């Protein structure tokens, strides 16, 4: 048995190892006869030997007709395929894997594999290649890499441009009435709930989401102002105002100028509010002092007239006290005399004229003293 059949059956026979030289010297199979008709059905896979040439596919028969698929492929793909499938690229082993013996017969082999595995179309060369061919393959591969890198850069730039081209949102222009209502609501609560936002939307005729965005921006502005004036803007302004009042320092012109647009729009609204209140309080105090000064002369004149018209009524407290003490003593003496007279049983004698006059004077003094006490009460 000679040829491929002998080489295929040689490993199965015991005690007869296959020499490498025999496999290398085996002639290629004869070409088919000109008169033979090709079989219409699929050809079963042929058993090949395990020699070096069979494994590498060097004994493959050339195709009987030229393939047109090679012309349809672009030049860049062919150059890249030649550089990959060349012995310098894969070490001369790739053709055996892509050859007819490397793929089983029950798999449909693609046309581009057959074209690329054809040694005549790819023009495989031995390891020693000409320097001109190496340069051309390297330049072709570098050109293809440059094209792919440029395509990637273009795709990245287009993606970045599409990201940057965002839809511009419509900017809401608030009226003075809307701003005033929003500021009032912000002073009441920095974080209004959904119900408060809906009520504010009905009042200002603004959408609820616009009101929510406005409150977010207003809170950010408020935090920025807090950082500018300290941890708490109200306490910082209060301390500043106290120091200015204590040392009689006037307000800076910048704060006064910012108050022209409105207290809430100024850089220190609480400080300006306190300054305004202090000015109003000072003006009210000045008015009260002027009214009191105008009323004081009238009171002085009235007192003088009253004192001048009735000088007898101007009695000191000491005189009243002395009169009251004397009246009490007189009453005590009368009581004592009456008691003594009743005890002794003596008939009361008639008083003389001098004694009657003295008693009358005492009674008049008592009556006058009682009248004075009533007036004082």
UniProtKB/Swiss-Prot annotation:
Main subcellular location: nucleus
SUPFAM superfamilies per record: Homeodomain-like (SSF46689)
Gene3D superfamilies, alphabetized: Homeodomain-like (1.10.10.60)
Comp. bias regions, Basic and acidic residues: 285-310, 347-377
GO cellular component: cytoplasm; nucleus
Subcellular location(s) of the protein: Nucleus
Entry-linked SMART domains: HOX
Similarity comment: Belongs to the paired homeobox family.
Protein name as it appears in the record: Visual system homeobox 2
Organism for this UniProt entry: Gallus gallus (Chicken)
